[in-house]
Each structure stands twice: as structure tokens, then as C-alpha cells.
Amino acid sequence: MSKILAIHASPRGERSHSRRLAETFLSAWQVRHPQAQVTRREVGRALIPAVNEAFVAAAFYPEPEARPLTMQADLALSDQLVGELFDHDLLLISTPMYNFNVPSGLKAWVDQIVRLGLTFDHTLDNGIAQYTPLLHGKKALIVTSRGGFGFGPGGELEALNHADPWLRTALGFIGINDVTVVAAEGEESAERTFAVSVAEAEQRLLDLARAF
């Protein structure tokens, strides 16, 4: 049975375009997979703590099996989020682009799930760090909305897009390399122009729902 983990990063709730597009995909996908499990994790309207000193000390404790109870508590949410990632086959991330990057809640989620010894490993080869991803066989779909035009591949503003390219990098680092991005652009442009972009994104998501 397929299991999909949906990460919603917009703080706007029902007014969010990226969230609505992602839910359009989910609805179509569930029609084709009625027995599948869908888990929604809210990171835009719920607080995901930023990494702090206590988290770093606990995450890099030299003997993970012997962590004190206080350190285990510092990593409890992170352990839960990592467990969710391993427990699902498919990852769906809906996010707007804010100031050229992702919202802080999504950044915090990524920081919580990129964990040494859990989602990636680290060794030294002649003193040079070598990294090994520990997630395998998973796919991801990123659904994003952008205020302007031209932030996609080949676009005039592509170099300013540090949102979905950064997500690709972070996901690839832990082993999720099969990543598809669907974007709606132009919310700050004319209403009709944005509507066309949204319609195109919706159609692509409906097509993906048949194959994802």
C-alpha cells in the first residue's frame, strides 16, 4: 500500500495557492489509490522549532545510544519527523517562495530531518569528509507558488530562486533524488495572467496523479 507524506509550508491556510494545488493533486491521487494512507504534516501554521544549541549537542553526541534523557527529549520531535519520512513512500511538499527561499517553518523542518546517523552518514577518507544518504527508493513532488515570473529553469530570474533548487539539494543529500517540481507563477501580476499559470499547474498535477 502506498503512503504519502504531505508537508504544507504556507502560513496562509485556505488562502494558500500552493496548499490548494497540492490538495488538488492529493484528491486526484487518492481516487486512483483509495487504500493509500495520506499523512499531513503542518509546518506553516504550526511551530517547528529552529535548531538550537541543545539540539546540536544532542544530535552530534558521540554515543547516540547513551544519550542522557534530556538530550533524548531535545531530539524527540526530530525523531518523530524522521520516522514519518522513513514510513512513507512518497513525499509531497507545498510551499510558497518567500524572499527567494522557503518559509522559515519548512527550513526548520528540513533542519530537523537532515540527521547524522539517521538520514545521512559521515565518514572520513584520507581526512576528507564523505557523505552517504540513508533514504532509498522514495519520490518527492514539490508544489510551489511564486509572486513573479521567470524563476523557473531558463527564466530571467532563475538565479534568484533559492526555494525549490535548495529543496532538491537537501532532499538529494539524504537520498531523495527523484524530485518533480510544479510551480504557479505571477500572483503579483494581472489576475488573468496568474489564473492561466494556476490552471496550467493544476493540469500538470492531475496528469502526475495518474503516474506518481
From Swiss-Prot:
HAMAP family: Azoreductase_type1. FMN binds at residues 10, 16-18, 97-100, 145-148. Keywords: Flavoprotein, FMN, NAD, Oxidoreductase. Its cofactor is FMN. PANTHER family: FMN-DEPENDENT NADH-AZOREDUCTASE 1, FMN-DEPENDENT NADH:QUINONE OXIDOREDUCTASE. Transmembrane segments: none annotated. It comes from Pseudomonas fluorescens (strain Pf0-1). Its EC number is 1.6.5.-, 1.7.1.17. It is an enzyme of class 1 (oxidoreductase). Homodimer. Binds 1 FMN per subunit. This is FMN-dependent NADH:quinone oxidoreductase 1.
